[in-house]
Swiss-Prot record:
Pfam families: TusA (PF01206). CDD domains: SirA_YedF_YeeD. InterPro entries: TusA-like, TusA-like_sf. PROSITE patterns: UPF0033. The active site is at 11 (cysteine persulfide intermediate). Belongs to the sulfur carrier protein TusA family. It comes from the Archaea. This is Putative sulfur carrier protein AF_0556. Transmembrane segments: none annotated.
Length: 73
């Protein structure tokens, strides 16, 4: 699993960092995004669905969101 720690960054920062990372990993790999920006919990899942990847988990932690995505293509 590759972790993208985008805490402290605001949208579209976390989304852009995740997209960049997804381009670098192999199909089937999992990317975990950590974001303190609440809008990431909405924006990233929308993009993942449109892009054809799998949204594994969206979870609110104490002071950030954990968004887990699996690259499907």
């Amino acid at each position: 699993m590759v972790v993208v720690d985008a805490r402290g960054s605001y949208c579209p920062g976390p989304l852009m960092e995740m997209i960049k990372t997804l381009k670098q990993v192999e199909v089937g790999e999992v990317v975990e995004v950590l974001s303190s920006d609440e809008s990431s919990a909405k924006d990233i899942p929308e993009w993942v669905k449109k892009a054809g990847h799998e949204l594994v988990e969206v979870k609110k932690e104490e002071d950030y969101w954990r968004i887990v995505v699996k690259k499907l293509k």
